[in-house]
Amino acid sequence: MQSLIGTGVALVTPFKKDFSVDIEALQRVVNFSIDGGVEYLVVMGTTAENATLTAEEKELVINTVIDVNKGRLPLVLGVGGNNTMQIVEELKTRDFSAFEAILSVSPYYNKPTQEGIYQHFKAIAEASPVPVILYNVPGRTASNMLPSTVIRLANDFDNVVAIKEAAGDMAQALKIIKDAPKDFLVISGDDMIALPIVLAGGAGVISVIGQGYPKEFSEMIRLGLNKKAVEAFKTQYFLSDCIDMIFEQGNPAGIKQVFQALGITENTVRLPLVSVDESLAERINDFVKNSIK
């Protein structure tokens, strides 16, 4: 899918200081990413703090992004969880007309076997009216979707079109790139190794830092896709300290501090997450201040 090549950003859900959803700030976040040149937007991913949003708030965020985007960029909707039947029901009842694809995380907490993971995504693929992006993030799910399972799904279902690979394991990403069907996309879910994955044949990234530095990060990925490694790595090295910092005390606390430093949103997150401490906030603020040209 050409629309999923390049940089997608996993949008935050901005909160006011009273922890209510800040719609005006969300509008600014969406426009900042679009104006910065990213290729697509991901709604209701992990970075959106969807686990601590009510059903009504989720719909508010989704509809706001659709309205602000106005069809300018492709949209991907996060539809995942550890209750397969519930996900299948959502896929059968929700209107997906505004979305290019869904992003579906491997089941967390239950710790399924590889066969369980396969059967979970088989049910999703058979129910989904739009293409499916698998999402492997073992640091959050406690179970790693192995390359053999990914490749099996890619071969068995035409609408399983990509994986967001966030195991942080280059060897694993390379095996999927090597063995998956020709048109299957390997999308990095790790900002720090996104460029190496792209240079190795990956299709791009679903990024966190990319919404704070959309122009720089998306251009870096485009350079990588065009095999202009030396030029691309200049941006990689420029942003590497900030990438480390935004994950130091958890996501999305770090990227929300970047947004606060940019004057786009508050840095508020909902419990059980907490905002970054004063020391890290100061370091992030200094980076942002010194990076503004």
Swiss-Prot record:
Pathway the protein acts in: Amino-acid biosynthesis; L-lysine biosynthesis via DAP pathway; (S)-tetrahydrodipicolinate from L-aspartate: step 3/4
Superkingdom as given in the UniProt entry: Bacteria
Record has Zinc-finger as a keyword: no
Compartments, record wording: Cytoplasm
Active site, UniProt feature: Y135, K164
A Gene Ontology biological process term: lysine biosynthetic process via diaminopimelate
Keywords from the named record: Amino-acid biosynthesis, Cytoplasm, Diaminopimelate biosynthesis, Lyase, Lysine biosynthesis, Schiff base
TM annotation in the entry: none
Annotated pyruvate binding sites: T47, I206
InterPro entries linked: Aldolase_TIM (IPR013785), DapA (IPR005263), DapA-like (IPR002220), Schiff_base-form_aldolases_AS (IPR020625)
EC number: 4.3.3.7
Purpose of the protein: Catalyzes the condensation of (S)-aspartate-beta-semialdehyde [(S)-ASA] and pyruvate to 4-hydroxy-tetrahydrodipicolinate (HTPA).
Subunit structure: Homotetramer; dimer of dimers.
HAMAP family: DapA
Protein name: 4-hydroxy-tetrahydrodipicolinate synthase
Gene coding for it: dapA
